[in-house]
């Protein structure tokens, strides 16, 4: 089956007036020359679907309760690829159920690419919520791996046993991530050398080791991560820049470049109150109420161009989890296409 769309196309480095042809779910042509066959005019901008590698919920349900509900809600708002994310406070037996449910949901919800485990091997001081079983248990984590759905798995690199854990999961094809941490440079470097390639929501739930010399600062966790040459960096981009100040995002981009920054939702809210896009439990900041469509709009309002935005909301997250045929309008890639307006506001799904 073949279909061609005509409109303004958001590419990796530019926007062109042209055509995108989809053949059997794969992009078969991108260019300015008119192809044969019926043409479907798109009023707005043709862009790759959003890719969210860190999403726990939607306003209707948590992924641990109903992965199908979460997937459907975010698909309707342009997220064509996502990782259902499970936090460290889920007990062992319940987490096994979550992974089984994810595997089943993937059969009928094609925007679920797999699971992201945010824990349980997390420094308790820098993790919100509860949970005490934070030392890696190989017997347990081997059972999680057996489901074959984990794509990204986060731990705190200062926790005992995590160097071996990171090495094990990297060998199994999972992308190790690090976060919720006060790790030293040496601990971050060890994690990186063992395979860690994603920094979980950089600048959030992190710290620095105690200073050795009065009046000076040690290298903090975030700075250590930014020194790793092939690391990707999650950033929560809410409207008022509560999680990450705009200037910190500018700093990150200046240091590491735009090609390794991944905008995420870290959505962790269930309920009717959508007056703000951040989520508080008591006085503690606990994730967001974001969709990736909201993230894209927030980035536009902060001054980023459409090609820059779609690197951060589609291409870079895909590359971070080794999904190399996604996140960019290019021949041979999955034809997951959306329409946005000139201000990056999501309009509709075009092809999925």
Model region roles, listed by residue range:
Residues 55-58, 68-95, 110-124, 148-158, ...:
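Divalent metal-dependent hydrolysis catalytic cores, especially in the metallo-beta-lactamase
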Residues 145-269:
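Active-site core of metal-dependent hydrolases
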Residues 49, 72-84, 88, 124-150, ...:
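Active-site gating loops and adjacent loop-to-helix segments of metal-dependent hydrolytic enzymes
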Residues 220-234, 253-340:
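His/Asp/Glu-enriched, well-ordered alpha-helical/loop segment
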Residues 49-51, 177, 263-264, 338:
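Residue-level marker for buried hydrophobic side chains located in beta-strands
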Residues 1-33, 349-351:
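N-terminal metal-binding scaffold of metallo-dependent hydrolase/deaminase domains
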Residues 43, 117, 169, 199, ...:
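Conserved, mostly hydrophobic/aromatic
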């Amino acid at each position: 089956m073949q279909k061609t769309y005509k409109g303004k196309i958001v590419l990796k480095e530019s926007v062109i007036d042209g055509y995108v042809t989809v053949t059997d779910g794969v992009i078969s042509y991108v260019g300015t020359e008119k192809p044969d066959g019926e043409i479907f005019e798109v009023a707005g901008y043709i862009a790759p679907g959003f890719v969210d590698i860190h999403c726990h919920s939607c306003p209707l349900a948590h992924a641990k309760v109903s992965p199908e509900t979460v997937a459907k809600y975010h698909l309707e708002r342009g997220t064509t690829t996502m990782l259902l994310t499970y936090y460290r406070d889920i007990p062992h037996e319940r987490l096994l159920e979550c992974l089984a449910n994810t595997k089943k949901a993937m059969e009928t919800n094609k925007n679920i690419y797999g699971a992201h485990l945010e824990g349980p091997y997390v420094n308790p001081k820098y993790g919100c919520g509860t949970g005490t079983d934070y030392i890696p248990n190989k017997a347990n984590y081997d059972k999680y791996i057996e489901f074959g759905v984990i794509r990204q798995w986060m731990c705190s690199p200062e926790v005992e046993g995590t160097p071996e854990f990171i090495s094990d999961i990297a060998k199994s094809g999972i992308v190790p991530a690090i976060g919720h941490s006060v790790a030293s440079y040496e601990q971050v470097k060890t994690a990186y050398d063992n395979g860690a390639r994603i920094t979980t929501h950089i600048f959030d739930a992190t710290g620095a080791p105690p200073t050795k010399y009065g009046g000076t600062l040690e290298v903090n966790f975030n700075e250590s991560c930014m020194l790793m040459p092939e690391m990707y960096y999650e950033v929560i981009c809410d409207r008022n820049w509560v999680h990450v100040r705009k200037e910190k995002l500018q700093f990150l981009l200046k240091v590491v470049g735009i090609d390794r920054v991944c905008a995420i939702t870290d959505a962790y809210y269930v309920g009717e109150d959508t007056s703000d896009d951040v989520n508080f439990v008591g006085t503690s900041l606990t994730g967001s109420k974001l969709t990736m469509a909201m993230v894209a709009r927030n980035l536009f309002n902060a001054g980023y161009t459409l090609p820059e935005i779609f690197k951060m909301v589609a291409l870079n997250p895909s590359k971070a989890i080794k999904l190399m045929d996604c996140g960019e309008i290019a021949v041979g890639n999955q034809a997951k296409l959306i329409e946005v307006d000139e201000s990056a506001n999501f309009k509709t799904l075009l092809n999925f």
